[in-house]
């Protein structure tokens, strides 16, 4: 029978997580009930997700740790990329958005940005005084 699996992340900021998902071309829906159906349509399981990117994939806040978790039905995963790659892409975009927001708050402006062969990101920032 299908069921939801929970994968821990280090993502804490909901607006940045939502922006990262949208930049990755996901249609993000807020406060959705995710649902999986058992074999042959018998039984089902539901879980609440603060940010959903499908009917059975989303992110929910762990109230104890204050960190978002990926919840998904890994048994019937039918995305174009493996779940590990999805998390890598989300983490990279989340980090990019966090850096952009931080440098902006510090009065800097991103002038150039490169994605390196190893998937790291390099930025050139400036600040006029």
Predicted segments — roles?
Residues 1-129:
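Interaction-mediating elements
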């Amino acid at each position: 029978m299908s069921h939801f699996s929970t994968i821990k992340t280090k993502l804490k900021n909901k607006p940045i997580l939502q922006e990262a998902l949208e930049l990755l071309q996901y249609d993000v829906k807020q406060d959705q009930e995710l649902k999986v159906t058992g074999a042959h349509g018998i039984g089902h399981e539901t879980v609440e997700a603060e940010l959903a990117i499908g009917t059975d994939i989303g992110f929910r806040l762990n109230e104890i740790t204050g960190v978002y978790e990926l919840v998904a039905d890994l048994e019937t995963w039918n995305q174009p990329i493996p779940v590990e790659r999805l998390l890598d892409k989300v983490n990279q975009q989340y980090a990019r958005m966090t850096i952009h927001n931080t440098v902006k708050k510090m009065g800097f402006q991103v002038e150039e940005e490169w994605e390196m062969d190893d998937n790291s990101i390099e930025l050139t920032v400036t600040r006029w005084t």
